[in-house]
Amino acid sequence: MASNKISFSFVLCLYMCSLLDAKSMNPTGRRCPDPNGVEKKSMCYSSCKTQGFMGGSCQGHKGNYMCECYEG
């Protein structure tokens, strides 16, 4: 009986932690220039706002940067 309560508590804790990750990123597939830490033209932000997201930024690694939108 005690192990069931512990298992339930553990699963509940994991579920709550997943809900706290509200600012998940959504890759859009739109390429963007190398941001060097700052996206100067705000291309991704405005593109994501147009699609109904809360905002976005240019993310990735050298030679492969994509716009990623914030869902919430």
Swiss-Prot record:
UniProt keyword terms in alphabetical order: Antimicrobial, Disulfide bond, Fungicide, Plant defense, Secreted, Signal
Disulphide bonds in the chain: C32-C58, C44-C67, C48-C69
This protein's name: Defensin-like protein 35
Primary location class: secreted
A GO BP entry: defense response to fungus
An example Gene Ontology CC term for this record: extracellular region
Annotated localization: Secreted
Source organism: Arabidopsis thaliana
Protein family (similarity comment): Belongs to the DEFL family.
